[in-house]
Amino acid sequence: MGVLAQVFAVFFNRSEFFLYYHVLYLYAMFWILLFGVGTKFFPMLTLTTPLSDNRKYQILSKKVYNSHLFWYIFSILFLVTFIFEATRYQILSLWIRAILVLFLSYEAWCLYFPAQRKGIYTFFIKLFLYTIVIGHFLFPLFSEHKQHLYHILFVGGYLGLVLIVVGRVLISHEKLDLTLEVKSKILATIFTLIYIALWTRATAYLVKTYENHLKYASLTALIAIILFIIFFINHLHKRYKTSKKEL
């Protein structure tokens, strides 16, 4: 839908469709992709799966929670909020989405349930997700600054949470030390830098040195990514050397 809107905007000179492209392609597609997958990943990484004792905390019955129809309807409603975001009903759509995100964070992400796994990963997953939930209530309250505040989602969700998931996959599939995700100070530093970059970018519009703040945020995030790559290359190399000796 986002690409189709861009086609109308570019090839048919219909500039009003550019807003739909912007919202549907740049926001909705990545949002739904990441957090749709996250519905399974986030509870698994923190060991707060709905199949555990946390089921007693949830609003939905097990039958409704496992219903594909319910989540299809939920997803369509969620998508509709993005469509209406590009219209005069922007504020209303942002409020509805904020409520849907709050519901999703409770029922699917199990964000407010006791986590059985403690450590670096659990702390930062919850920190990023709490910030994203709060951010969705800031969007309608400060809609005139939405393009800046949306970086709470871009940096916290698309960067921070994706790196957490990538790191977990590497640790699991490459049989690295599982304690890395529990007490690694380097990983803690990396995710702290990303969180600093998040707020540096989201609040850049508040200061006179706007462009400098964009540079600070970009540089901080870039340093975090480089450290992340070096960290896992180093551990993968050690793992490879150990495997070679065992052969």
Each model region followed by its residue ranges:
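Hydrophobic alpha-helical transmembrane segments of multi-pass integral membrane proteins
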Residues: 1-247
